[in-house]
């Protein structure tokens, strides 16, 4: 065990660090999963609370997060390059189904991902239109926007961004790329281009919110199948947990928040706890021969 490496300082400030970890009710010898390693803030703190017999499995689909995780030199720790929806397969591989004392998820995009312009998550910084959390697979936002129809894009913007001007924005994006094909000009390929196009398409501006906020969120959620990933994990999480195991989730936007609250509410109501049997005290007496 190397506690110095386990709880090293980081420029990234972990959101709700103590609140989320406290929700796990850590046992010093427990087995835990950090399903969204990110830059390791939660994982390092969990490790600092575990004994030499504790264990932490971290999961992330971002290659940069995996690189950060490899900096942790601790025999109690291991990293899995995968999305958290694959936690059941990871548990099965490690023979840990039904043995996990706690699972932690910090949903959505991380601040380091937003800060890195080349990742394409932020409309505040110019970068390539990528938006993939795992840059090794799947379509980038640029590639998807080249082929999407107005109808499908409108649905995505409404469903995942709750954008009231979805049709206007979708039409502007698809028409721009169609024009590029016709005129031999460049497709939408930069975050700044997309943000400006959305701003022009939106008839009314919110003083407190950038016009592209909801659209960027919607496209990112779709590209990364974020809500599908969450639903898949929620459907299997309880089977992974040991008796008295904990599930601690940080959610930010209303869509994932509703999913988590609905899950928690239903499971609390529907959970069937084993019946407790009470028996009379057995009296013993000493028999002398």
From Swiss-Prot:
GO molecular function: rRNA (cytosine-N4-)-methyltransferase activity
One of the GO BP terms on file: rRNA base methylation
Reactions listed under catalytic activity: cytidine(1402) in 16S rRNA + S-adenosyl-L-methionine = N(4)-methylcytidine(1402) in 16S rRNA + S-adenosyl-L-homocysteine + H(+)
UniProt signal peptide: none
EC top class named in words: transferase
Places the protein is found: Cytoplasm
Residues the entry annotates as binding S-adenosyl-L-methionine: 40-42, 60, 84, 106, 113
SS bond list: none
Described function: Specifically methylates the N4 position of cytidine in position 1402 (C1402) of 16S rRNA.
Name this polypeptide is given: Ribosomal RNA small subunit methyltransferase H
Species name: Haemophilus influenzae (strain PittGG)
């Amino acid at each position: 065990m190397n506690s110095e490496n386990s709880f090293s300082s980081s420029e990234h400030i972990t959101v709700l660090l103590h609140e989320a970890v406290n929700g796990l009710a850590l046992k010093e010898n427990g087995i835990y999963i950090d399903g969204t390693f990110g830059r390791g803030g939660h994982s390092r703190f969990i490790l600092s609370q575990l004994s030499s017999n504790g264990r932490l499995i971290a999961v992330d689909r971002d290659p940069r997060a995996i690189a950060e995780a490899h900096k942790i030199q601790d025999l109690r720790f291991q990293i899995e390059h995968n999305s958290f929806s694959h936690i059941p397969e990871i548990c099965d591989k490690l023979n840990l189904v039904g043995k996990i004392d706690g699972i932690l998820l910090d949903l959505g995009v991380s601040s380091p991902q937003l800060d890195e312009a080349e990742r394409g998550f932020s409309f505040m910084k110019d970068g390539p239109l990528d938006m993939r959390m795992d840059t090794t697979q799947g379509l980038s936002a640029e590639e998807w926007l080249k082929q999407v129809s107005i109808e499908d894009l409108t649905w995505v913007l409404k469903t995942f961004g709750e954008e009231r001007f979805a049709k206007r924005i979708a039409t502007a994006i698809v028409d721009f790329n169609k024009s590029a094909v016709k005129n031999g000009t460049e497709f939408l390929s930069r975050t700044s281009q997309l943000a400006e196009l959305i701003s022009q398409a939106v008839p009314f501006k919110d003083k407190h919110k950038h016009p592209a906020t909801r659209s960027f969120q919607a496209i990112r959620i779709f590209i990364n199948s974020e809500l599908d990933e969450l639903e898949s994990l929620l459907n299997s999480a309880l089977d992974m947990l040991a008796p008295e195991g904990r599930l601690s989730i940080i959610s930010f936007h209303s869509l994932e928040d509703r999913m988590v609250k609905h899950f928690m509410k239903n499971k609390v109501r529907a959970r069937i706890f084993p019946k407790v049997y009470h028996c009379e005290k057995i009296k013993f007496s000493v028999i002398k021969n």
